[in-house]
Curated annotation (Swiss-Prot):
<dbReference type="InterPro" id="IPR003700">
    <property type="entry name" value="Pantoate_hydroxy_MeTrfase"/>
</dbReference>
<feature type="binding site">
    <location>
        <position position="84"/>
    </location>
    <ligand>
        <name>Mg(2+)</name>
    </ligand>
</feature>
<keyword id="KW-0566">Pantothenate biosynthesis</keyword>
<dbReference type="GO" id="GO:0005737">
    <property type="term" value="C:cytoplasm"/>
</dbReference>
<comment type="subunit">
    <text>Homodecamer; pentamer of dimers.</text>
</comment>
<feature type="binding site">
    <location>
        <position position="45"/>
    </location>
    <ligand>
        <name>Mg(2+)</name>
    </ligand>
</feature>
<dbReference type="GO" id="GO:0015940">
    <property type="term" value="P:pantothenate biosynthetic process"/>
</dbReference>
<feature type="binding site">
    <location>
        <position position="112"/>
    </location>
    <ligand>
        <name>3-methyl-2-oxobutanoate</name>
    </ligand>
</feature>
<feature type="binding site">
    <location>
        <begin position="45"/>
        <end position="46"/>
    </location>
    <ligand>
        <name>3-methyl-2-oxobutanoate</name>
    </ligand>
</feature>
<keyword id="KW-0963">Cytoplasm</keyword>
<protein>
    <recommendedName>
        <fullName>3-methyl-2-oxobutanoate hydroxymethyltransferase</fullName>
        <ecNumber>2.1.2.11</ecNumber>
    </recommendedName>
</protein>
<dbReference type="GO" id="GO:0000287">
    <property type="term" value="F:magnesium ion binding"/>
</dbReference>
<feature type="active site" description="Proton acceptor">
    <location>
        <position position="180"/>
    </location>
</feature>
<feature type="binding site">
    <location>
        <position position="84"/>
    </location>
    <ligand>
        <name>3-methyl-2-oxobutanoate</name>
    </ligand>
</feature>
<comment type="pathway">
    <text>Cofactor biosynthesis; (R)-pantothenate biosynthesis; (R)-pantoate from 3-methyl-2-oxobutanoate: step 1/2.</text>
</comment>
<dbReference type="Pfam" id="PF02548">
    <property type="entry name" value="Pantoate_transf"/>
</dbReference>
<keyword id="KW-0808">Transferase</keyword>
Amino acid sequence: MKPTTIALLQKCKQEKKRFATITAYDHSFAKLFADEGINVLLVGDSLGMTVQGHDSTLPVTVEDIAYHTRAVRRGAPNSLLLADLPFMAYATPEQTFENAAIVMRAGANMVKLEGGAWLADTVKMLAERAVPVCGHLGLTPQSVNVFGGYKVQGRGDAAQTLFDDALALEAAGAQLLVLECVPVELAKRITDALTIPVIGIGAGNVTDGQILVMHDAFGITGGHIPKFAKNFLAEAGDIRAAVRQYIAEVESGVYPGEEHSFH
């Protein structure tokens, strides 16, 4: 199989072909996802909650991300692999570049950063140094203490700010953007305005791609289940069939449905 590239996702956007992505944290699941047709994987700092058992993503370190990135890369050698830079790992441009180098050497193709226009200079610095960047707007879990919890973002007056943030990140050189927990109407406006692919999670079926935390997709998340999540394993019966169903529903636009969306 040929390596999946950012250019391929760009082509999907241009041809209006939706694509499915998912989080992965280990060799076995990475291989399974790649074998079944999900070729864009994220080593997310969500591992702090799903793998390590913390109540937020804040305790995750760069070393944690690098460890799991190496494992995922071994399982999915041809996948496009995104890796989060965790909380406090990109406070300065110099620190950002050093930490990006660590996860890129571990096997990532791209780093993901949470934040808006204030990150533009950092994104530009990375892009100029051949480090591909995925932005992340809306509900950014590293800011949970600022938001006061996990809440929908981009409603009312905040919509224009979030829209402007998206434009600023693209202008700075970001090549992908994740939108999390934003109203469908705003997600469509941003997706239509940007030339780069937009991946949604809790942003309706109007984005170019979708992503889910794998534990949510298989119904093995303890405690609160996000509105946007769907347990594909419950319907499909086994994990491989669940992955195929997830892909099919994303590509057809069936998932996410109205019941998974915000307004």
